[in-house]
């Protein structure tokens, strides 16, 4: 095996969202600006409100990007990354299934490392035999938090 990567923390319990988000604030990580990435359904149905409500209670400044479509394109991720660049978050919260989480991860790479050729990076991950690409160090500008709303994709624990 060339490498193994797992999230630093995994909260797995009904109702743990509030506790997990509260750790982003002064209690543990002292983050102040959250960029929430989700899809139109979760945003318009009000499901994203639970995340933004907790962020509001904490006094954390936040903005939302909800233009993620199923099987998001690189153009979608670039649009989100441009908004990130303007907003300057110190935490990115991906809420949804595989599409919002994958789009948010790409946005995160583009935000942290705008010099990276994403097409080259992605192609190296397509063929398991060629996974020798040195992934850029992440987390200098923002930490990444995934809140899965579906079971099955595993996007919350994979790089792409």
For each of these PLM feature ranges, what is it?
Residues 75-160:
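Glycine/threonine-rich beta-strand-loop-alpha-helix active-site module
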Residues 1-91:
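ATP/NTP phosphate-donor binding region
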